[in-house]
A protein has these predicted regions:
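A short, small-residue-rich loop immediately preceding and capping a beta-strand
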Residues: 22-25, 46-48, 66-105, 276-284, ...
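Active-site diphosphate/adenylate-binding microenvironment
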Residues: 9-13, 27-31, 35, 353-438
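Conformationally flexible catalytic loops at phosphate/diphosphate-handling active centers
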Residues: 3, 47, 148-153, 157-212
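N-terminal cofactor/phosphate-binding cores enriched in small/glycine residues
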Residues: 4-89
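Phosphate/pyrophosphate-binding active-site segments
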Residues: 1-3, 134, 296-397, 505-506
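Glycine-rich, anion-gripping cofactor-binding loops and their flanking helix/strand elements
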Residues: 83, 220-305, 408-438, 453-454
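Conserved thiamine diphosphate
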Residues: 69, 116-164, 331-332, 483-506
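Thiamine diphosphate
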Residues: 101, 108-121, 125, 401-506
Length: 506
């Protein structure tokens, strides 16, 4: 098999394959030519060429999100790797595995006036789970076995119980384009520790006692579809003292759950003790609703258990008691194996009654519209969308409007809620559509978000299963509905940032 003449590059490619990474998004360049050649020549690797590095980063993110596996990114030296940073930070806060391969000059040439050269070492240090620096000038100073183990450790980190992005920066000398017949397999896999699936029973006994004696609120953030967790939560939601709140991006649906948090909290009396939980259980990633976050921070919650391996010290509600590094399905399955007692507190019933009233009021509210509004447009789109598709929601107003409507049965909801930026919504949705042609993928985007990421449309071949709906309101409509900017005289120019460009012209 033909490959790059550089042993270091061959070793890296073999290690990627050993850890199941077979898809690579390549951004064209010269310094990363040895990788481009090695990837292209390898029969087990599929490459996707994306010119704009910022778009490339989010396309890789969408692929990893859709497949549930690590995707590699590869770019040339200089500012190219900086353009990956928005996607890297999104992957970090979403716990999505990416392996960023940035080609570089050898360290001896950094900050000495050579072209297309910046300090790339540790460039992502605040938003990655691990990094490794390899330099062709220094490669022979360690054994092949040492390099194999270092790479294996890095790739394990990306795909551990707490997943996320890692960075491999590789200093390469010229010549860059030479090839050889590859004869050695450099792959080496290290043994992995299996994550725990259960709490020790004494710890679980304490939690069960608290469940039996308290008003319990379970809040689900952004998650992949999880039928097992949904089943276990359905069982818990049958108890009168347990309430389950979900958002569309939680991707679990059942009539026992409260799906539209902001709709339910509209007009909610936050001082009413009957609605305040004593025990808070959270799972998943980001929660869209600012109202529920503000409410829970001031609700006097006695204990908060955070379920999952990711970000164990993240104290969103300022009442964190303990992070439990189990998967949600394993944790709730163990809860249900124990004897829960249905206490007499009608906590669930009160919340559900509030939800039903809010839903009826919402119908009345929408029926009174006499002119076209963003909400009406969104409701019309919701009514027309078929089941069994992947619905991608761009950030700002779109993802918030979606939370005001009941989820469409069978639809999976996706959104870049790690950093909640508008910069990569189209590219992320496109990446998901590219690797899963069996599903229809629809993105709903505002005009500003769409224009910001319009280089995604440069990708070819463009997937036929990807549809894009742009809500054209000539600016950042979110600033008309959030407190503060709506009352500011600077709103139109500096916040809403009115613009006249039509997405149809792109």
């Amino acid at each position: 098999m033909i490959s790059s003449s550089k042993i270091m590059v061959q070793l890296i490619v073999d290690q990627l394959l050993a850890y199941g990474i077979r898809k690579v998004v390549v951004s064209p360049g010269s310094r990363n030519a040895p990788f481009s050649i090695a990837f292209d020549e390898h029969p087990e690797i599929e490459t996707f060429v994306v010119h704009d590095e910022r778009s490339a980063g989010f396309i890789a993110l969408g692929m990893a999100q859709e497949l549930g596996e690590a995707i590699a990114l590869c770019c040339t030296s200089g500012s190219a790797c900086l353009n990956y940073y928005p996607a890297v930070s999104e992957a970090f806060y979403r716990s999505i595995p990416l392996v960023v391969l940035s080609a570089d000059r050898p360290a001896s040439w950094i900050n000495h006036g050579d072209g297309q050269t910046i300090v790339q070492k540790d460039v992502y240090k605040n938003h990655i789970l691990g990094s490794l620096e390899l330099d062709e000038d220094l490669f022979a100073q360690k054994s092949i076995e040492s390099h194999q183990e270092e790479l294996a450790s890095l790739l394990q980190i990306a795909q551990s119980n707490w997943k996320g992005p890692v960075h491999l920066n590789v200093g390469l000398n010229e010549p860059l384009y030479q090839t050889v017949e590859k004869t050695i397999d450099y792959a080496k896999v290290l043994p992995r520790e299996k994550p725990s699936k259960r709490l020790i029973q004494t710890e679980m006994d304490v939690i069960i006692q608290e469940f039996n004696q308290s008003k319990v609120l379970i809040l689900c953030g952004q998650m992949d579809a999880n039928p097992k967790a949904q089943l276990e939560l359905m069982k818990l939601a049958a108890f009168p003292n347990i309430v389950v709140l979900v958002e569309n991006t939680s991707n679990i649906q059942h009539e026992r759950f409260i799906h539209c948090i902001d709709r339910t909290l509209n007009g909610f009396d936050q001082t009413n003790e009957a609605f305040k939980p004593e025990i808070l259980i959270t799972l998943g990633g980001a929660v869209v609703s600012k109202r529920i976050k503000a409410y829970l921070r001031n609700a006097g919650v006695k204990k908060h258990y955070k379920i999952g391996a990711e970000f164990p010290e993240m104290d969103t509600y300022r009442c964190l008691t303990k992070a439990i590094p189990l998967s949600p399905s394993d944790f709730f399955e163990q809860i249900n194996e124990n004897e829960l007692i249905a206490n007499t507190v009608n906590f669930n019933g009160k919340w559900k009654a509030l939800d039903i009233i809010a839903k009826d009021r919402s119908r009345e509210f929408h029926s009174e519209f006499t002119s076209l509004t963003d909400l009406q447009v969104f409701q019309t789109i919701q009514d027309l969308l078929p089941e069994d598709l992947v619905l991608h929601l761009a950030n700002s107003s779109v993802v918030r409007y979606a939370q005001l409507f009941d989820p469409i049965p069978g639809v999976r909801y996706e959104s870049n809620r790690g950093t909640s930026g508008i910069d990569g919504s189209t590219s992320t949705a496109l990446g998901a559509a590219i690797v899963n042609s069996r599903k229809q993928h629809v993105l709903i985007s505002g005009d500003i978000s769409f224009l910001y990421d319009s280089n995604a449309l440069w990708y070819a071949p463009f997937p036929r299963n990807f549809k894009l709906i742009v809500i054209q309101n000539y600016g950042g409509g979110i600033f008309n509905i959030i407190t503060g900017p709506a009352e500011s005289k600077q709103r139109e120019r500096y916040f809403e940032a009115k613009q006249a460009k039509s997405p149809a012209s792109i």
